[in-house]
Amino acid sequence: MGIKKFKPTTNARRGMTQLDYSEITKKSPEKSLLESQSHTAGRNNYGRMTVRHRGGGNKRQYRIIDFKRIKDDVPATVKAIEYDPNRTANIALLVYADGVKSYIIAPKGLKVGDKVQSGSEADIKVGNALPLKDIPVGTVIHNIELKPGKGGQLVRSAGASAQLLGKEGKYVLIRLASSEVRMVLATNRATIGAVGNEEHELVNVGKAGRTRYAGQRPHVRGSVMNPNDHPHGGGEGKAPIGRPSPLSPWGKKTIGKKTRNKHNKSNKFIVRGRKRGRLGNI
């Protein structure tokens, strides 16, 4: 899809861009594949805030996505490419030969009328889902499973892709977009191709209201708070942090501090860690 620009009729319009949605072929979603979802505004079952900066936003219905792709050897036709308000990628409506309908994440290059299939015997073409052991080395993939039958968990956002680097026994090596190289069971499934809607990252929001539509509330800097509200707060005017390292509102090191558990059982599957920034070793 292309990027649509606006004339600077107001300050908010100046610089604002949005996707032109030229790839979208169907506006109304499939009713049988919808579920209602409630907005929690970052509150838990006690009503206490557990995640900051959430609330409001437009009402959405959840589209039931088939991340598992276990309907093997039954060809499906792409009936429509649709917008999904719950994710950055678009979704494709499939109609199987037996009449069953389902949604999948729309990969780059998938068009209405294309045929897709899942299973070990499927061809290596965009939109087909196969076990990793049946995918050739060097293939670009997305929607990768971490546990057999659980459904794709990795590489699902707009423009994302991973590459199959090699096969070692019952594992395969994949390189993620973060440059991390990871071992995954060869019996896990993945879908061929990269996720579509790659221009999503080029969109300029332009005004605060569009962020509020997404259910995000303002993120106030700690340096403008009082010292009883944040470790960075207080001082006369624009005061420095006054600490050796930036801290979270609860006094923990942040910005570059590794938050992954050192004893995480899946650490042994990471062959090479992702590249980190200047503060990556704090």
From Swiss-Prot:
One of its GO terms (cellular component) is large ribosomal subunit. Residues 34-43 have a biased composition (Polar residues). Pfam families: Ribosomal_L2 (PF00181), Ribosomal_L2_C (PF03947). GO terms for biological process: cytoplasmic translation. It comes from the Bacteria. The keyword rRNA-binding applies. Part of the 50S ribosomal subunit. Forms a bridge to the 30S subunit in the 70S ribosome. This is Large ribosomal subunit protein uL2.
